[in-house]
């Protein structure tokens, strides 16, 4: 049987400008499929799956083939604990060069004083930020006060007292229902809540937006050591100048998690007081989402925290992933281009267009709209849960995720809302006309979902139904959009058998 690569090259024969990256990508799939068929098949099936649905999960995107190829090489074999030119292992010169270039690119892209590119994820980056703050603001002064040079010099009793002192300090962050993230400290099941006394701030019940006066009041009351700002499900921008002033008034560290909107900062959409870099003491982010890179994290910090963060090993990390760091470097370089800036602005334009068409058709959006890349639909008036909407939309080829809303009466599993984002559809090249069509498809589906009737004649709270004629129409409309805006068009799916 002819290989995938042979079929691809036969089909491409005579075509001008044959893309080297797509050839290399297909060659890798070809090898994997023949050497480890079950794994290769699953990878190809995922590619087919992603090409057959509209990806509207706000935290997902599509990395370029160049980014993906940068991860698939022998860099994965190298141990390199430490930081560039200060490793705990020998023969790290090439990894040093890659990590140094990646960090310098991050500093250039964001205008940051320092950049640490090793975190494996946004959660790792957030944990490192918290540990760096604890080390700088609590542990360091305590060790100095006791007359020691390092924490290892403390007696067992003194160390126990220090841990108790750390636990008494307050971290103030956005609650989960108000759009915060698990790693912002307000979810007790998460390790972050176990490091300090973590307290939440909420959005205003009427406006569903963060109330800076209320945050300032809470800061004056609780005198936190750390003020966390950022979000995973909030459709407006933040004023980091105001948040910095609030933090400074009580001597708190301002830590911003910009995982969701880093690409909008890099692309010049969020500027001045909406850009956290000039104001925050520490900024964390993922490298996927709006940055379109590999799954990973970054920490951007002021000089005060640079030394501590670059000692992430042994603070809370072991060996980094040099192959992923190489992919981060590629993605960050892509984000320096003019095309990326155009992309970032289009992401927000598309989100606003989507929101406008939802509202015209009577759907309620949290905060009344969007200023960024996402929007949250309140499904309460439709009588269905976020879980049901997520499942039904998935069945017709649209990927969204269920999401809690403030004062959610349904609960954190089923939820009363769904979150939608435009980063991935914008990467495919879709614009305002396509957003109108997407909105029309979603509204028609949501308005025709009914609750499934149980055997006892009651209605299910977790399962819904969609009339087959509506489902077929929606699938056809989704397929039409995807046929005009295919994922990785340079990869011919006809060869992927």
Swiss-Prot record:
<comment type="pathway">
    <text>One-carbon metabolism; tetrahydrofolate interconversion.</text>
</comment>
<feature type="site" description="Plays an important role in substrate specificity">
    <location>
        <position position="288"/>
    </location>
</feature>
<dbReference type="GO" id="GO:0019264">
    <property type="term" value="P:glycine biosynthetic process from serine"/>
</dbReference>
<dbReference type="GO" id="GO:0005829">
    <property type="term" value="C:cytosol"/>
</dbReference>
<protein>
    <recommendedName>
        <fullName>Serine hydroxymethyltransferase</fullName>
        <ecNumber>2.1.2.1</ecNumber>
    </recommendedName>
</protein>
<dbReference type="InterPro" id="IPR015421">
    <property type="entry name" value="PyrdxlP-dep_Trfase_major"/>
</dbReference>
<dbReference type="InterPro" id="IPR019798">
    <property type="entry name" value="Ser_HO-MeTrfase_PLP_BS"/>
</dbReference>
<comment type="similarity">
    <text>Belongs to the SHMT family.</text>
</comment>
<dbReference type="InterPro" id="IPR001085">
    <property type="entry name" value="Ser_HO-MeTrfase"/>
</dbReference>
<feature type="binding site">
    <location>
        <begin position="180"/>
        <end position="182"/>
    </location>
    <ligand>
        <name>(6S)-5,6,7,8-tetrahydrofolate</name>
    </ligand>
</feature>
<comment type="subunit">
    <text>Homodimer.</text>
</comment>
<keyword id="KW-0808">Transferase</keyword>
<feature type="binding site">
    <location>
        <position position="176"/>
    </location>
    <ligand>
        <name>(6S)-5,6,7,8-tetrahydrofolate</name>
    </ligand>
</feature>
<keyword id="KW-0028">Amino-acid biosynthesis</keyword>
<keyword id="KW-0554">One-carbon metabolism</keyword>
<dbReference type="GO" id="GO:0035999">
    <property type="term" value="P:tetrahydrofolate interconversion"/>
</dbReference>
<dbReference type="InterPro" id="IPR015422">
    <property type="entry name" value="PyrdxlP-dep_Trfase_small"/>
</dbReference>
<keyword id="KW-0963">Cytoplasm</keyword>
<dbReference type="GO" id="GO:0004372">
    <property type="term" value="F:glycine hydroxymethyltransferase activity"/>
</dbReference>
<feature type="modified residue" description="N6-(pyridoxal phosphate)lysine">
    <location>
        <position position="289"/>
    </location>
</feature>
<comment type="pathway">
    <text>Amino-acid biosynthesis; glycine biosynthesis; glycine from L-serine: step 1/1.</text>
</comment>
<dbReference type="InterPro" id="IPR015424">
    <property type="entry name" value="PyrdxlP-dep_Trfase"/>
</dbReference>
<dbReference type="Pfam" id="PF00464">
    <property type="entry name" value="SHMT"/>
</dbReference>
<dbReference type="InterPro" id="IPR049943">
    <property type="entry name" value="Ser_HO-MeTrfase-like"/>
</dbReference>
<dbReference type="InterPro" id="IPR039429">
    <property type="entry name" value="SHMT-like_dom"/>
</dbReference>
<comment type="function">
    <text>Catalyzes the reversible interconversion of serine and glycine with tetrahydrofolate (THF) serving as the one-carbon carrier. This reaction serves as the major source of one-carbon groups required for the biosynthesis of purines, thymidylate, methionine, and other important biomolecules. Also exhibits THF-independent aldolase activity toward beta-hydroxyamino acids, producing glycine and aldehydes, via a retro-aldol mechanism.</text>
</comment>
<dbReference type="GO" id="GO:0030170">
    <property type="term" value="F:pyridoxal phosphate binding"/>
</dbReference>
<keyword id="KW-0663">Pyridoxal phosphate</keyword>
